[in-house]
A protein has these predicted regions:
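N-terminal signal peptide
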Residues: 2, 8-22
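Short beta-strand-centered segments at strand-helix junctions
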Residues: 57-60, 92, 137-157, 247-251, ...
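Aspartic protease catalytic domain
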Residues: 14, 49, 123-130, 180, ...
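Aspartyl protease catalytic domain
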Residues: 16-30, 110-232, 316-327
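Signature of the N-terminal lobe/flap region of pepsin-like aspartyl proteases
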Residues: 29-122, 126-130, 135, 260, ...
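Extracytoplasmic, non-cytosolic globular domains
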Residues: 237-279
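Short hydrophobic beta-strand that contains or immediately precedes a catalytic carboxylate
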Residues: 38-40, 45-50, 56-58, 141-142, ...
Length: 428
């Protein structure tokens, strides 16, 4: 009897901590966009880990392929949550053209052609969305946002946690495993970097509050370079987005890569393609030099290294697509996709409202980075003091100017009065 109980306890703990396997699936012809498929029992969900999303999405995977329009619940969501079973509340959905209609109940989605999707033990608050920028493809994303457009109490992760529909608000991405709930025991050491939820004015209102880490320096080239060889790119921010199989870099840093990489190690073998003032992509003729080139991203003094060989994809014509894009929007926002997510473990901790990164190395340049941070803080403090002093000087100058003007007015007024008295004619 006791042995049976111990076995049951062991199995319960194993099931509770068992990672949910996920696979990567190419979803368009360009083979640049990926989705993660999570299997929970007999159910399968497509999700996108998006650290800037302020809305948490749970997608539909059963939408028929001949549905050409997709719904975005953020435009139509008017009801309160959770659903009231007694009132049989529903959320009605319709796309912009009215071609597809549907409704969401507490545990059921109906979308087009009378199709009904049962969602056992899950709260369903969104369906596939429509991306107009990069072709028309269906994809769903589970956004690990902190706030929503409707207030903190409407956060799907928090709501699901309170209703035990999702066990925890902690997600761990570790190569091809996604953990829900407790952080894996082997991550009992301190994370190499962590960042709190921040408010970035670089993002739209819908995505403004999210897990955004600070990126201060990059090193381009050989691994034996020191912190002195790094390039200061602060204040830059990083988001993590599993839907993209590339690293997105703001256009403002294009010249840095041009001078340190493409006019140096890769001179003459790459061409640049600009797409409608939206982005710049890079195609190269050969990749023999890539294995000796590294990009080192310094976050909180820790270095996260990606070999340029891991940022390439061979095209059908034999040329090499470099998985780096320069985006014209968001001047300071970098986005790290699968090339980074595959190499490092990322913990999105909704209970502490932080993101933790594991696997970064700091021994080579953490001390120098710390000195740089102190130097920057000292310079900022000196700038604040200088601004304060200049402000005081300006205020004092304006004060004395006003006083001088008032004195001058008074003297001028006395002179006028004296002149009037002196020139006054005697009364007859």
């Amino acid at each position: 009897m006791w042995k049976f109980l111990w076995i049951m306890i062991f199995m319960c703990n194993y099931i509770k901590n068992k990672p949910i396997e996920y696979i990567l699936k190419e979803i368009n012809d360009d083979k640049e966009f990926y989705t993660i498929i999570i299997k929970l029992g007999n159910q399968s969900f497509e999700v996108q880990i998006d650290t800037t999303s302020s809305i948490s999405w749970v997608p539909s995977t059963a939408a028929k392929s001949n549905i050409t329009s997709y719904l975005n619940i953020s435009n139509y969501y008017k009801s309160k949550i959770p659903f009231d079973k007694q009132k049989n509340e529903t959320i009605l959905l319709v796309d912009e053209d009215g071609d597809v209609q549907g409704e969401i109940r507490e545990d059921t989605l109906s979308i087009g052609y009378n199709e009904e999707i049962k969602l056992n033990n899950f709260i369903f608050l969104a369906v596939t969305f429509y991306d107009k920028l990069f072709k028309d493809y269906p994809n769903g994303k589970l956004g690990l946002g902190y706030k929503t457009l409707y207030g903190n109490n409407s956060n799907i992760l928090k709501l699901s946690y309170n209703q035990t529909k999702i066990n925890k608000t902690i997600f761990t991405l570790e190569q091809n495993k996604l953990y829900f709930g407790e952080i894996p025991e082997k991550l009992n050491n301190y994370p190499s970097s962590s960042c709190n939820i921040t408010d970035s004015n670089e993002l739209d209102d819908e995505y403004r509050n999210g897990w955004i880490c600070s990126l201060t320096h990059i090193i381009i080239g050989k691994l034996d370079q020191t912190f002195e060889d790094s390039i200061d790119i602060s204040p830059s921010k990083i988001t993590f987005d599993s839907a993209f199989n590339y690293i997105s870099i703001p256009k403002k840093f294009y010249d840095i890569f041009l001078n340190h990489l493409f006019n140096n190690e890769l001179k003459g073998i790459c061409t640049f393609n600009e797409f409608e003032n939206i982005e710049i992509t890079i195609i190269c003729n050969k990749s023999s030099k890539f294995q000796d080139i590294y990009l080192t991203f310094i976050i909180d003094g820790f270095g996260y290294v990606i070999n340029l060989n891991d940022l390439t994809k061979k095209l059908d014509n034999g040329k090499i697509l470099l998985l780096i894009k320069f985006k014209f929007e968001n001047d300071n926002i970098w986005s790290f996709g699968l090339p980074f997510i595959k190499l490092y473990t990322i913990v999105f901790n909704g209970e502490k409202n932080i993101v933790e990164l594991y696997g970064g190395e700091r021994e080579d340049f953490f001390e120098e980075w710390d000195k740089w941070r102190e130097h920057v803080s000292s310079n900022q403090e000196n700038e604040r003091r200088m601004l304060f002093i200049v402000g005081c000087i300006v205020v004092c100058f304006m004060f004395f100017l006003v006083v001088f003007f008032e004195i001058w007015k008074c003297k001028n007024k006395k002179n006028v009065n004296a002149s009037l008295i002196f020139n006054e004619e005697p009364i007859q």
